[in-house]
């Protein structure tokens, strides 16, 4: 039995609130149960130096956690003077995932920066961030089209992500912190709305897992992501 009494395949209640802040071209509050992440998308004309003159755009991401998003206060990374390896890994993951969803030629020489700030953490912050960031990205692209900055829609498909893992010998979806911290296997999966894989991050935290268990986890992730995409579509409708 899971601590929350959810079934193995059951995700937490998922809520996506658009236009959560006033200034960003796209802004979303995404909630996976008690995990809450603010995702903003900022659209700027121009691209980084390495892309200038190539007629294509760029999408990148930054990720951070508020000091009291966790059970005990942690120092701001700005106060420490450097980002942790975990932060760098997560923001690269978010950026890679979002770039997979965008036709950079149709974006033109424009840049979208996605900022994902964890307000409250209870496991699955990176997967929640990707899910919310995708909706913020859609809103930023629609803003740019409305302004006539870009003509065609560069979005190829929606993407979403979920954590899956093996907890007390059972494959489960959307792990909260108490499960994540005790899981034998922990995996983050990013997929397109049609179920194609963008990224898999999987680690045997306690016991090595079998090929059969890997396939079981991927099926679990695919089914959960299908449900999460439905939430995205409902928010965007």
Curated annotation (Swiss-Prot):
Oligomer status and interactors: Homohexameric ring arranged as a trimer of dimers.
CDD domains named in the record = RNase_PH_bact
Looking up InterPro entries in the UniProt record yields:
ExoRNase_PH_dom1, ExoRNase_PH_dom2, ExoRNase_PH_dom2_sf, PNPase/RNase_PH_dom_sf, Ribosomal_Su5_D2-typ_SF, RNase_PH, RNase_PH_bac-type, RNase_PH_CS
- Identify the keywords attached in UniProt to this record, alphabetized: Nucleotidyltransferase, RNA-binding, rRNA processing, Transferase, tRNA processing, tRNA-binding
Any one of the GO BP annotations: rRNA processing
Its biological purpose: Phosphorolytic 3'-5' exoribonuclease that plays an important role in tRNA 3'-end maturation. Removes nucleotide residues following the 3'-CCA terminus of tRNAs; can also add nucleotides to the ends of RNA molecules by using nucleoside diphosphates as substrates, but this may not be physiologically important. Probably plays a role in initiation of 16S rRNA degradation (leading to ribosome degradation) during starvation.
Pfam families, per database record = RNase_PH, RNase_PH_C
Q: What is its EC number?
A: 2.7.7.56
- Recorded GO terms, molecular function? 3'-5'-RNA exonuclease activity; tRNA binding; tRNA nucleotidyltransferase activity
Instruction: Tell me if Acetylation is a UniProt keyword of this record.
Output: no
- Which of this chain's residues are annotated to bind phosphate? 86, 124-126
SUPFAM superfamilies in the record, alphabetically? Ribonuclease PH domain 2-like (SSF55666), Ribosomal protein S5 domain 2-like (SSF54211)
- The protein's name is Ribonuclease PH
Family the UniProt entry places it in: Belongs to the RNase PH family.
Reaction(s) catalysed by this chain, per the record, are: tRNA(n+1) + phosphate = tRNA(n) + a ribonucleoside 5'-diphosphate
Whose protein is this, by species? Answer: Shewanella frigidimarina (strain NCIMB 400)
